Each structure stands twice: as C-alpha cells, then as structure tokens.
C-alpha cells in the first residue's frame, strides 16, 4: 500500500530559500513544479551528504560539485528517496516560484509478509 503522509505548497518570493534537509523517516518524497525555471529563480538541488569527506581526487573524477541542480519544468513531478539531502537556492526574482511537495510511506501487507517468511 502507498500512503501520502503529508502534502504542502511552497511559495518562494525574492530572498526566500530552503535550507538543506531530508524527509526521514518517510520512504519517498516528491515535488511538483508549478512553474518553469527562469533566470534568477531559486533552484531545487540535491546535496551530496558526504561531499566534505571525499578526497580531492574523487571530487575531481566523480563529484565536481556538492550540489546537483534540477531544472524545473511546469507539471514535472520529481520523486526521490526521502533520505536524500536537498534544498532550494536563494530566489532572486520578483516573480513568485511555486511548488507542491509531498511525502509517501510504503506500507507492507504484514499478513502476506508473514506468510512468505514461513515458506522457508
């Protein structure tokens, strides 16, 4: 079973941003972009949780930046594991940026799960 645990709308005006965070203990999180990306708009990004622990060689080879920016497209839904660190950069536009975000929990059918364990 899939259960939407929370849903909320975010409105970003000039100077607004969202600090780096995750959505534990949920399983999946998502964001629906209500606007296309425009210049100076806040940008959704994923943050590499262990970036500061990487050696310079690994950073140069595989992770040149600690953040991966996702271009917003109106109507696009982005799903990701809730443990992934993410945020929104500072919004520097006079045009409002809008999103709808949500958390999802996956609920196992405990009765069927127990039956499968007894097969061994």
Regions found by a protein language model. Give the residues of each.
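Catalytic core of non-heme Fe(II) oxygenases with the double-stranded beta-helix
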Residues: 3-79, 89, 106-118
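Ligand-binding loop in jelly-roll beta-barrel domains
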Residues: 85-99
